[in-house]
């Protein structure tokens, strides 16, 4: 069963207050793949017509995208712990689902965490020490690792939050953090993690830059092992689609594309990659500077690609110039930052009526944008 909602962690740009809001996931999807393909064809026609109208000197920018509109009312409001008594020096560092779309964990810069239950509208404050030891393991666990591992603090770079998923809210036992064995590459100075994913119910794959290798962590035996001198082809996390028996993620070589591979075909060899390209919405103007791109798994082969941009059109201080050498910018100037949410659906080959594509196809659905004025989207989970 697919997800019903996308959770947005939003910051009030004026007060610094954060809130949790939700939008229906089906807002990003057409009723059918046929309707999506017809809409994409019309969008491409509009794109081409706009470029032709401006003699190839101007990019459509947001003109071919839908506006998300006003954000829904907040379900929760919260604020990070002030840093040294200074309210302006505070921020959230982390947001994640806990088992399902209705339970969210949020942590601030000081390590304080809260759990939000969207259905019961309840909050669990969890300020327990993150270095708790013990052998009690609940039904589900959330694993958290520093993306850039520091050898001096490696003993605390990998932790797990144990909790129960049998309750709809947080009225059960208080979740607790436990430190785990650091990864083998933690002794390297520049051991940045490039990609990671869950392979089965008890195994996590992690690829690192230094050295270029992929490792597996057994969550039952709590042991690491080296898989080989290869890295997964993803930038950040990858998600498994059981209907297609493939892992999908943003490509490390092409950040505006998806790629897919089978990580279990032969763990000793690099996985074979299938590139899946997005289309119009990711043909961006040169003045759009991306600083956050994420892939959200909605289930049943559906994804939401989250792209947050800062527009630098006309900002000479950032070295932006119009490469067309004319008086027209490559898109209408957009002030500040904005987000683009795109619904994608991965489907297998049809295999009938001679329409077999010979592999997985990507169907692009809707792309919707939201300008950051009074509110900024910090996380989509």
Label every PLM stretch briefly:
Residues 1-381:
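Beta-propeller domains
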């Amino acid at each position: 069963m697919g997800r019903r909602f996308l959770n947005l962690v939003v910051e009030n740009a004026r007060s610094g207050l954060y809130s949790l809001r939700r939008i229906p996931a089906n807002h990003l999807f057409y009723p059918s793949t046929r309707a999506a393909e017809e809409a994409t064809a019309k969008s491409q026609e509009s794109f081409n017509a706009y470029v032709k109208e401006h003699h190839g000197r101007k990019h459509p920018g947001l003109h071919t995208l839908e506006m998300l509109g006003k954000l829904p009312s907040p379900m929760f409001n919260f604020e990070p712990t002030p840093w040294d008594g200074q309210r302006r020096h505070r921020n959230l560092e982390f947001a994640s689902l806990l088992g399902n779309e209705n339970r969210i964990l949020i942590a601030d810069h000081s390590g304080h965490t809260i759990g939000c239950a969207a259905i019961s509208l309840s909050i669990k404050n969890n300020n327990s020490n993150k270095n708790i030891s013990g052998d009690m393991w609940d039904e589900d666990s959330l694993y958290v690792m520093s993306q850039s591992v520091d050898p001096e603090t490696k003993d605390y770079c990998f932790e797990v939050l144990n909790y129960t998923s049998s309750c709809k809210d947080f009225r059960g036992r208080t979740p607790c953090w436990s430190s785990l064995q650091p990864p083998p590459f933690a002794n390297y100075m520049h051991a940045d993690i490039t990609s990671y994913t869950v392979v089965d119910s008890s195994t996590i794959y992690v690829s690192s830059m230094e050295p270029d290798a992929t490792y597996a962590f057994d969550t039952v035996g709590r042991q690491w092992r080296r898989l080989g001198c290869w890295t997964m082809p993803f930038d950040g996390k990858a998600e498994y689609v059981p209907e297609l028996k493939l892992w999908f993620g943003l490509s490390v070589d092409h950040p505006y594309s998806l790629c897919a591979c089978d990580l279990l075909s032969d763990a000793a060899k690099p996985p074979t990659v299938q590139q899946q390209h997005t289309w119009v919405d990711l043909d961006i103007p040169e003045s759009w500077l991306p600083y956050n791109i994420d892939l959200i798994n909605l289930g049943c082969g559906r994804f939401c690609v989250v792209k947050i941009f800062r527009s630098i059109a006309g900002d000479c201080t950032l070295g932006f110039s119009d490469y067309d050498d004319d008086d027209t910018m490559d898109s209408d100037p957009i002030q500040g930052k904005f987000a683009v949410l795109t619904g994608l659906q991965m489907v297998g080959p049809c295999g009938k009526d001679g329409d077999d594509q010979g592999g997985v196809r990507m169907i692009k659905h809707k792309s919707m944008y939201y300008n950051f004025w009074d509110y900024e989207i910090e996380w989509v989970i």
